[in-house]
Each structure stands twice: as structure tokens, then as C-alpha cells.
């Protein structure tokens, strides 16, 4: 078969691609390492309805399922995002990073997963497992690696090497069966290289290979994976299926079901399964539709990786499957599954001692010799078909190092750390570290960092609910959400089907906004609008002794705004006009309302969040210049540009320069220690301001005003900016200065100070109510 790829550049490229999907199980635990007995987090909805986040056997055993992707990078990003979403939504709990369980309660207290109805088939199946195998063994967790070759690759090979009168599906079945056969023979190598469950609590399992660790936990003396050993999660007795043909494979499983050995194909706990995408997953469905992908079930959770698996491990497994496709039939044992099982168990229980294996002729061969034989073949086909790919060769070299030096295996490293720290403490420390890493980047959707932060937030919240998300226009932050037959189109997180087009036009035009609000007795600042800069300049005498705001007529985010609270010159006024007219063809000059500016986020006639916005500022230290202080403050990892992070970097543009000049300062001025220097008069977070949550503290009086303003304009998702007087006695002197039809949500979700609000959830509730 190798020659087919050497002769065809297109097939060579396709060989190293594929379709990938991952399923990962983690147990939810309390902060002291005990099985969490809380229900599955409600935000994820019914398990039957969420395609991404379900439970495995136990209510406490969460399962994350990626969609099928076309690269290892993208499937890894999906898994990372799901892990982060689940971690952040599992309040006061952690995700246990090991395949072997945490501290467990009595068998009868381990909760089986709950479903919509007590007689759900999923519930009944789990009750069957609990009765047949016990609950504790069901809590062994791991990763399932789903893979299929590109259809174009199958087509190309079918044209070249199919048998006479062989249908394409029969050919496809034969190829996948061949890969599965290679996997079954050589899976011991995969367990040696990826196994990560050699340690466990003493009351969970006992084998003749046990040794006690200092904390009282147990370890396989030279073992690699309890989960993949005979003491792990296996069928009650060995089930050998016939890999010589697809029909024989189907017949084998059917016979075991008819004999009552297993209830259904779901209970066939083979390390690799042939599957199709039909949801019933019955043997009859597989027989009818044929093989569509392979499911590898023997991958342990790697406690040394926050995601439970590394990209290199994913890439190596892919190479392992490619090797199966390229293998010659003579390389495969003639259906000697018992020998393959013995090799698997031997490595799982004794792999670090590198015991001798049995080859197809039942002769002993060293682990190193057998492993290097396969790894060298992988290296050879990479060199032959993809010589420029040094990364893949490096992955193979890493596996060789583990083979030659057992102490470098994942299992050996885990055992060493557990011996040092203790079983529970090590895994808890890992879980806490991973949680801290997740929390530090909680605002982020991996792989969507180029999109606005508010878009990333609502996308993550949609995933949590099992809502399908399609990116329609990445540059425009335009998404489609689908839950069942319900479809919603959303742009920039808050432009939705609930918007009234005329309402948007009114809010876009600040003059119209003020007129309409004033007509409904809602207080707004008085002022004039100008479309001619010369006429606006001539009006200087009307404003020179007043506190004023100069701003563009139709912009958001505080761009182009200048505020004069103190005496200003004609030159200052002219510069403010220059700035405002650079953003719009018309500007507004209006009275300045004293007080503090607050953003009220109103969704469907309810104030969901209130934010106090502090203008962009720096605090002096008596040493550094204003410019240097700005540069230092901008190094905060939570500050970015273009709404990609919770806070915006402070700019050093004309608006900030003007603000400094109004204070008789420049960028080279050195403020005194603890002296606060404001770089902006307007307090928009979008221009570098700081955000402080005030939702609970805000007087309901002003919340009602915000709601009334949105009702006047028939705005359903709206940011209302209100100047609130500092003295309660003056509250009637408030004023609405702006209504925003596309309010940013990220500043409420991740404020500089105060409680984080789940605004994405609120918008999704509104859209899918």
C-alpha cells in the first residue's frame, strides 16, 4: 500500500489528515478530594439535549464531547474550551485529573446519572452496569479518541487497490478492520507510551502487583495503567471477535449479545471499536451502514496535562493509526487476540520493568526491540512520504526516549510525584493549578481570540448550553445559534432578532435620542448639533464660560469625546472640534452634567448590570513620566485592544494629549507619588477606563429611569449611560447622556472590580425563552 502513496502526491497529503473527535471524562470533586455529590450543573441543561457536555456513568462523572473537526489543533482547542467551560461552571468544585478515582463514598452512595425520566434507556443501562460490575469500577475515567480517514483518501485508495466487484463500503469496512487489527496487536505500545494510572487509593483496588506508598495509597510496583489492566474496566470475561472480515466481526458481537454475555454493543468494552455516526449505535445499525470511524477507548487521563492529553499524544495516536493502514497483512497476527491481551495486561501491570512480550509466533521479544521496530517503521514512512515534517519525527523521537528510558514515561513521572506528595494531594494540587490557569483566562475562547471579547463570551455560554454555533462572518463577529429548530442570528453579541431597526437608527443618532427622550420627560443635557465645523467654531462665545461636552453625533464606545469642566481656550475648543469631526460629519456640543457616570445594561426591560466607569488614569510614583506609567499599566494581561480583552489599553492619542494639556501636563511630566492623573474625561472602558460593578449598590430609582428610557425607544438590549449626582438630595439632577444599541457585555462579565455578571446567559435566555 505504501507505493500507492509514493506515486500520488494528493494521497500523500490526505494520509496525514483526517477527522478527529474526543470524549473526555472527569470526576467532579470537592476541595478536599472527595467525590462531589451535587447534581450535574443545571446550566448544561438535560444531558440528553446537550451534545457537548453530558455525564458518563455517575452524576458526578462529567463527560465532554467535541464535535468532529478536521485537525488535531482544532479538536484540542475544542477540548480545552469544554474543559474550561465545565471547570468555571462547576462552582466550588474541581475536575479530578486522574483516570483512577478520588476519595469515594460507600458503594450505595455513588450517584448514578439522572435523566429526564427514571425509565430513560440511559438510566436503565447504567443501573444494569451497576448491578453487573459494581459502581466503583465505573468511575474509572479516560479519553476516547474518534478518528476517520478523509473520504477523498478512501476514494483514492478504492480506485487503486479495491478488489474486483468490491463495493466502496465493503472496501471501507475492510480498511478500518485492518487498522483495528493492527491496533489490537500493538496496543501494548500505546499503553506503555500514554498510560498514566499506576497509582490509586488502597481501598479502590487490590492486585498482587501492589506496593504501598508513604501516604498509604497504592501503586502498581512496575505498572503503567491500572485502568487498562485486568483489574481495570473490562468485560466480565474476554470477548474475542473475529477481525478476518466485517461480516465475521458483526456476527461475533451478535453472538455474544444473543448469549447474554453483553446487553448490547455499548457493553462491548474493547480497546477499539468500529462505529458509525447513527445515534442508536446498535450492531444492526453498524451492519447496515458500515464503518464510518474508529473509537479508541484505552487512553488514560494524563494528570500532567491540564487537558488530560497533549497535542503530541494526539498526533502520535494519529501516526499509530496511519501505521495500521500502511501495515502489510503479514505483519498482523492471525487473529491471536489472547496473545495480544496478554501483552496488553503485561505492560499495564509491569511496563516500567520492561517485561518480555510474545510475538506472533509466541516467541519472547523485548519491549524495547518490539517498540523500536514499530517506531522506526513510523519514522520511515514519515521520511518517505513527508520528509519535510520535522515535527512528526520529533514526536517519534520523544516516544523512543520513553521506550529507552522508562523513567521518562508519563506513568513513571506520575508515580514519582504521588510518592513525593501523596495521591490525593498531588491530584488536588494539579486540579487547583489547572483551575487557576482556567480562571486567569476565563474571558477567552481558545481559537477565537481574533474576535471581539463579547462575542467570545456569548459563544462560550452557548456551548455550555449545548447550542450549536456557526461563524457566518468572522471579521464582523456574526454568529448563528441553533438549538433544535430554533435559530438565532447574532452580530457582535448584542445585535439580535429582538432589535427594532428604527430603534437602532434612533440610538445611533444622538440628537434624535435626546429629542425623543426629552419628549417623554426624561432628563437629557441641553445642547446644539453642528454639521459645519466653521459654524461650530464661531459658536465658541456661546459655550466659553460653561462646562461642556464635545462629541460626534453617531459613534459608540466614547470615541471622539472631549469634556471641558474647567475654563478652556479657543485653541482647546478648536482641537476638540477637530477630534469630534474626525469621527463624524456632525457633532454635538452639550452641557456637562456633574456626577458619576454609570452604564446600565438593560435586557428585555430588566437591568441586568450596572457599572461605574472610571476614566483612563495612572497613579504617579514620583519617578516615572506619564507616558511610562501608561506603558506600565498597559502591560496588565487583562488589557488589550479592539475589545479582545476585558479592559482596553490606555491610548496616547490627541484626546489624551488634550486632557493632559488641560491639567498643564505633558507626556513627559512626572506625577507625585500617589497622585492620580486622568487621561480622559469621559469614562468609557473602551477608551482605557476602569470598570467597577455597582449592580447591587445602585438605587432602584435610577434603574427604573434606565428601563423607561429603553421602553421609550423600544430597545430590548441596550446600554444606558446615566450621570448620577453624588448627593442623594440632588438625584433629580441626573441626566441620560447616551443610549447604546450595541452595548459591550465583557466589561460586566469581567469588571476591573466587583462581581462578574453572566450577561451571555441573560442574552441567551432572552433569545431562546
Swiss-Prot record:
Keyword Nucleotide-binding part of the UniProt annotation: yes
Keyword list, A-Z: ATP-binding, Glutathione biosynthesis, Ligase, Magnesium, Manganese, Metal-binding, Multifunctional enzyme, Nucleotide-binding
Note accompanying the cofactor annotation: Binds 2 magnesium or manganese ions per subunit.
Pfam families in the cross-refs: ATP-grasp_6 (PF18419), GARS_A (PF01071), Glu_cys_ligase (PF04262)
Region of interest (Glutamate--cysteine ligase), residue spans: 1-347
Binding residue positions for Mn(2+) 1: 721, 738
Top-level taxon of the source organism: Bacteria
Stretches assigned to the ATP-grasp domain: 514-768
Annotated positions binding Mg(2+) 2: 738, 740
Binding site for Mn(2+) 2: 738, 740
Binding site for ATP: 541-599
Pathway: Sulfur metabolism; glutathione biosynthesis; glutathione from L-cysteine and L-glutamate: step 1/2; Sulfur metabolism; glutathione biosynthesis; glutathione from L-cysteine and L-glutamate: step 2/2
UniProt cofactor(s): Mg(2+); Mn(2+)
Family, per entry: In the N-terminal section; belongs to the glutamate--cysteine ligase type 1 family. Type 2 subfamily.
HAMAP family on file: Glut_biosynth (MF_00782)
Primary role: Synthesizes glutathione from L-glutamate and L-cysteine via gamma-L-glutamyl-L-cysteine.
Quaternary assembly: Monomer.
Protein name: Glutathione biosynthesis bifunctional protein GshAB
Organism: Listeria monocytogenes serotype 4b (strain F2365)
